[in-house]
């Protein structure tokens, strides 16, 4: 699993320190990445191994696909890496400098400030918002199936449900009337992020190209959603002495040691609107896909709803919403015996780590029972790892498990075709063309 020929240097005096594809052109590789990034990464990994260097000039660029390599980057060397990469810079065009994209200096105090909003008592209280969201969804499904089974787009249904729950649990507001507009704006904005990442000639957002104008209109709609959310809560904000406060209470607290600016508040709200519902919706959509294409597992879940956590955990392994995690190295260090120079771009791929036989038996199989003895410390990174582990992980797992358990108990959910659904490797993993399923109320 090594290259037949390894040059000493690539263009612009970039040293070669690890195996990787050679002999091709940058343009050829770029076309392959744009066409089908997941297949391209899998092919490169299978041919060259767990640490791969791409044939590009500066910055030196590496793909890390092993459990140990991922841990080295995300945990052991987290102080020697930065989020100042193209991936997060493009995402910041939408979210601003929120918790997801902020670099270490800005991130650390913000994480400390927001952590109380994700303590166990707040996570427990979020169950109420999951129940409310599910009740609304089931009323809608009952109306849709009054005349018999009907076909719905499960991807869109999970997007809308996750957004309502996120806004209720984190911000204490009901945005039911705005759900369609906010989800559409989110998808449009994220599509712009991906388009920019795949186009090295993309012009700055301030240049009024049709694509840039479309993306800016979507961002403006997200800004309007922030205004709506704050206005809806302004008259009902809990005092700083309240025993339990949600995230919006914390953000709007004027008595913070360093009160947040309007821009900082906006950035955090948009970050959690986007990340808080997009990732959960993606995980749920693929969980349903795995269930409807594995009827035996669907039956097990219907008979034992407590298996929902296992199903969701396995779905996150096979279809991790964040399929790549990037870092810029601040100093030189080694990964799996290979030198990674300072100022390199490192790409950790949960998609590949979760398919690595060093951590998983039968890695391509949907086997929820593999998690009956717990979640492994090494090789499972759908929420990242280390200091930058997703702050909303526990809330997302609770929310997703409740949704899978209840809907599987109350509804027959079936695939309408047996063909494999292609994956769109966008900011998160999404099904191309949605996820059509047939639903009917269980008698």
Where are the predicted features?
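N-terminal membrane-proximal hinge/A-helix region immediately C-terminal to the signal-anchor transmembrane segment
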Residues: 2-105, 109, 128-136, 176-177, ...
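Conserved cytochrome P450 K-helix/beta-meander segment immediately N-terminal to the heme-binding cysteine loop
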Residues: 348-374
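Cytochrome P450 proximal C-terminal region
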Residues: 10, 14, 45, 134, ...
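Conserved cytochrome P450 K-helix E-x-x-R motif and the immediately C-terminal K′/meander segment
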Residues: 29-49, 224, 305-336, 357
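Cytochrome P450 catalytic-core helices
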Residues: 279-302, 394-411
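Cytochrome P450 heme-thiolate monooxygenase catalytic core
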Residues: 2-18, 82-88, 106, 122-282
């Amino acid at each position: 699993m090594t290259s037949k020929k390894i040059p000493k240097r690539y263009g612009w005096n970039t040293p070669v320190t690890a195996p990787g594809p050679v002999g091709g052109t940058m343009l050829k590789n770029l076309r392959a990445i744009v066409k089908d990034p997941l297949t391209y990464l899998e092919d490169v990994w299978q041919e060259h191994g767990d640490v791969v260097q791409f044939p590009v000039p500066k910055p030196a660029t590496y793909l890390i696909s092993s459990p140990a390599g991922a841990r080295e980057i995300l945990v052991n060397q987290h102080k020697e890496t930065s989020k100042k990469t193209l991936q997060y810079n493009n995402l910041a065009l939408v979210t601003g400098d929120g918790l997801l994209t902020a670099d270490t200096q800005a991130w650390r105090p913000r994480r400390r400030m927001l952590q109380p909003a994700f303590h166990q008592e707040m996570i427990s209280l979020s169950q109420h918002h999951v129940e409310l969201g599910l009740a609304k969804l089931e009323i809608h499904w009952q109306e849709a199936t009054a005349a018999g089974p009907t076909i719905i787009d499960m991807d869109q249904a999970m997007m809308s449900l996750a957004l309502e729950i996120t806004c209720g649990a984190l911000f204490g507001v009901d945005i039911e009337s705005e759900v369609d507009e906010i989800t559409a704006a989110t998808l449009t904005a994220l599509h712009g992020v991906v388009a920019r990442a795949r186009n090295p000639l993309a012009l700055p957002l301030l240049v009024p190209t049709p694509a840039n104008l479309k993306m800016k209109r979507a961002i403006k709609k997200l800004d309007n959603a922030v205004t709506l959310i704050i206005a809806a809560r302004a008259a009902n904000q809990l005092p700083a002495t309240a025993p339990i406060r949600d995230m919006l209470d914390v953000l709007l607290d004027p008595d913070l040691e360093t009160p947040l600016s309007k821009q900082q508040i906006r950035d955090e709200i948009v970050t959690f609107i986007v990340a808080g519902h997009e990732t959960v919706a993606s995980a749920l959509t693929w969980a349903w896909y795995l269930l409807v294409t594995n009827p035996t597992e669907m039956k097990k879940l219907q008979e034992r709803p407590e298996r929902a956590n296992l199903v969701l955990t396995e779905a996150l392994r096979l279809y991790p919403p964040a399929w790549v995690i990037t870092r810029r190295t601040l100093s030189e260090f080694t990964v799996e015996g290979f030198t990674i120079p300072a100022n390199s771009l490192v790409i950790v791929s949960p998609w590949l780590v979760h398919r690595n036989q060093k951590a998983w038996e039968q890695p391509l199989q949907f086997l929820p029972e593999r998690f009956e003895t717990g979640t492994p410390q090494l090789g499972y990174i759908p929420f990242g790892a280390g200091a930058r582990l997703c702050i909303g992980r526990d809330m997302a797992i609770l929310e997703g498990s409740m949704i899978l358990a209840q809907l599987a108990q109350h509804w027959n959910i079936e695939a309408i075709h047996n063909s494999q659904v292609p994956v769109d490797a966008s900011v998160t993993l999404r099904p191309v063309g949605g996820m059509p399923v047939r639903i009917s109320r269980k008698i």
